[in-house]
């Protein structure tokens, strides 16, 4: 047992991609800089644990406000009783945020408690959940927000250098020639392609028939199989996901925005997905992700953790995957300066596999120096009101090598 002495929110901003990257043009109106939100938990034994909530990428000041609201209810309590501390947070927040923003803060605090407890016990975080079940997990490259052939080729070169053989791109229903082109181009490297259709950000989201038409048109010009379709329709249409599973013969996945294990488990029981994508920085922390792994095993489907946050969120999700014998994890491809600072030597990729982290805690490094050099910029905020980025028409991707 070790009591919680203090809790504080830390907002950090760092360079992300470059000014001409399509995601920056779409979602970062103030330029190529991204913010993450951490929670630092200091124990009476002097150990510090760190967690992250994905909310801070989009609403950093909201993240800080909710953290400040919650922290008086945890000071002086036992860090090692993590389930009890999560219950305390639910008592504070569930009436007014049973789903949504407060769950991201609960996630951050829970991850910080796991980090602090495992550091205190001098073991990697996965040991708190029964130990790692494997020494390596296959990675898929997560990128494909590309408006030129050269940009796609640069990302394929990066995947080749790491030995990664699966690649997720972003596409919408109009991107028929673009998708066919990258399916063919990636196949030259022995790389399979999955599609994130990003319908969590669409208003209104596309319909089931839009997706089936998109897939049918691609099949007319490329014989390369799409590996999976992620968030192909909006999250409020679970029956549409079920219809897609029955009709198009491609793995259907989603779930990154779901903020409670209950909701995701209900979707699993309803046979909505071929695999699910929980995120420890969203759904309530690492213990919540463990619940999802346990449930998917009962239904013979896979859990592939979503890992598009900052370094702390990524490593928390990887720790869950190692504890539960995950088969695949996400590797974000847009350069984010804080990654090289905070991963240290703990995120290693060899021959397309993420190697098991071995440091105590969740496997991240943090210091006063990092905090001072990456101080919060209140303009470095992701905007979900997606701007027109000036992408080329689909005809740009027409290739004589396509059918």
Summary of predicted features, one role per range:
Residues 42-120, 395, 402:
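Metal- or metallocofactor-binding catalytic centers and their adjacent structured scaffolds
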Residues 1-38, 54-59, 75-79, 89:
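Motif-centric detector for short Cys/His coordination patterns
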Residues 130, 135-243, 247-248:
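Metal-dependent enolase-superfamily TIM-barrel catalytic cores that perform enediolate-based chemistry
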Residues 2-12, 16-19, 31, 310-403:
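Flexible C-terminal active-site loop/helix
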Residues 37-44, 347:
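Short beta-strand elements
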Residues 46, 70, 109, 122, ...:
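Conserved, mostly hydrophobic/aromatic
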Residues 101, 106, 110-146:
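Glycine-rich, aromatic-flanked loop segments that form ligand/cofactor-binding clefts
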Residues 225, 234-253, 258-365:
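Shared catalytic-loop signature of beta/alpha-barrel
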